[in-house]
């Protein structure tokens, strides 16, 4: 019932337009509009707004620190790692649990000069993730595939062939993050 009334109110406003009234058959117009309209739960709208804020923040910091050419790589890595969510914890590994948007482990955060306890703070994690990217560039990364490899394997091992299982994982990650 609510859907119909929303369509009706919107329809009345749109049909009052002389262009729409003369150019469109109202029945076909509304059938097409109904097919395009997607009703989204409020929680999803809030989640997408939060993601938009994170995406904008990553874009701003990467542009400032690394340049426009690295924005797409940073966004792909953040999407693969956390879906742009700030309070995400990765699975337990022999290196520890990765945290935040860029899924940094405590030792990486510490090495980069960041407090591991602040990795759930979105701004702090983004700054640490961008600092990691900066080190990767210093170690010779020149393209998105190299950046994905460096993010997953570390700046000392990004361009070497790893043990079979780790190499397979690295290659799958590179394909996801550079697609």
Regions found by a protein language model. Give the residues of each.
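Substrate-binding strand-loop-helix patch
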Residues: 26
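Catalytic glycan-binding domains that act on GlcNAc-containing polysaccharides
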Residues: 29, 35-179
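Hydrophobic core
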Residues: 13-14, 18
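Boundary at the C-terminal end of the N-terminal hydrophobic targeting segment
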Residues: 19-23
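Sec-dependent signal peptide recognition
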Residues: 3-11
């Amino acid at each position: 019932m609510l859907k119909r009334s929303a369509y009706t109110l919107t329809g009345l406003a749109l049909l009052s337009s002389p262009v729409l009234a003369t150019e469109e058959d109202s029945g076909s117009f509304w059938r097409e509009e109904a097919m395009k309209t997607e009703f989204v739960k409020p929680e999803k709208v809030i989640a997408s707004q939060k993601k938009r804020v994170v995406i904008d923040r990553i874009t701003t910091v990467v542009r400032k620190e690394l340049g426009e050419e690295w924005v797409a790589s940073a966004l792909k890595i953040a999407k693969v790692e956390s879906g742009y969510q700030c309070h995400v914890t990765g699975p337990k590994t022999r290196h520890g649990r990765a945290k935040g948007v860029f899924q940094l482990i405590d030792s990486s955060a510490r090495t980069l000069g960041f407090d591991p306890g602040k990795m759930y703070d979105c701004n702090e994690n983004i700054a640490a993730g961008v600092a990691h990217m900066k080190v990767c560039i210093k170690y010779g990364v020149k393209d998105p595939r190299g950046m994905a490899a460096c993010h997953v394997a570390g700046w000392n091992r990004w361009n070497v062939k790893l043990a079979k299982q780790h190499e397979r994982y690295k290659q799958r990650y590179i394909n996801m993050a550079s697609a």
